[in-house]
Amino acid sequence: MCIRDSAWANSLFEDFCEFGLGMTLAVEKMRERLVKLMNRAIEGDSCPAETKELFAAWIADKDNTERSIKLEAQITPIVKANADKCEICKEIASLSQYLIKKSQWIIGGDGASYDIGFGGLDHVLASGKNVNILVLDTEVYSNTGGQASKATPVGAIAKFAAAGKRVRKKDLGLIASTYGYVYCAQVAMGADQAQTLKAIREAEAYDGPSIIIAYAPCINHGLKAGMGKAQAEEAAAVACGYWHLWRYNPELEAEGKNPFTLDSKEPQWEKFQDFLKGEVRFASVMKQYPSEAAELFNAAEDNAKWRYNNYRRLAKQQWGVEQED
């Protein structure tokens, strides 16, 4: 693993996608400048043949992470050693931090992604740029005091939904998948670490926009077992069908395969209601609005079943364009 340069930069919560796209475009421009400089060096007489070969190899493999790491280790010492007598080498040396292909991730919460910043997120996905987005889905505006967002499920209490939310959660992942060229995944690390890592690897390798939505238990959920059991809570959420694991990879459709993979096992629906009762955001409805709690909790379970059945249908359906006879 090669870790270099800034590990983190951030702007306002709601414009995290636009900010991240700007950072990505900035790196892209710097690397384009490197290509121009190396082409000038290749065409000129100031560099020896061996250096020109390295420059040509980097131009060909600059988007291959492993190759760019190896080539950077060879190119950087050469251009730095010749910086005083070669202007092109001096400029390349000043941009050497961009020789290695960077892994860039845009990270935000559900409030910004599903709700107040959704327009920005949609714009970034629609750009077609090779960006990676990770949404930490706490199902509530965690940073601003626990207000309900479009990620908040039916029956959960939050600010602006004091009697329990009455409409179902937005399916951000499926909305993004309708573009057809966006890699999408829904994960829960505590439920399946292998599936989470696989989704991250696939998103990083995919040449285009990607979005991963990760279930993230939050202090606003009021876990009765305590936040120290957040990973176990994720496992329970998937086991009972509250949260589902899946991946949508457009590259598979190009190969004539089904791009949608449902990674969740058949839920144990009999555990669903107990899962809700294990979190204060749901249990509070039973105390404050007992006459409505059963109806809301049943609606929450029905919504989860509806969503799971939809995913199961997508995992079985025929994809692609049907050819006429």
Predicted regions and their residues:
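Structural signal for hydrophobic packing residues in well-ordered secondary-structure cores
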Residues: 31-45, 59, 79, 125-129, ...
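Short, small-residue-biased leader/transition segments that mark boundaries at the very start
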Residues: 1-3
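Long, compositionally biased charged/polar accessory segments in the mid-to-C-terminal portions
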Residues: 221, 235-280, 286-322
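General structural feature for long, well-ordered alpha-helical segments within catalytic domains
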Residues: 26, 30-37, 51, 67, ...
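Hydrophobic alpha-helical scaffolding
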Residues: 20-28, 114, 162-166, 186-190, ...
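Glycine-rich ThDP/TPP pyrophosphate-binding loop and its adjacent helix/strand module
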Residues: 84-86, 92-93, 98-106, 113-132, ...
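N-terminal leader/propeptide and maturation segments of large enzyme subunits in energy/redox metabolism
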Residues: 9-84, 88-91
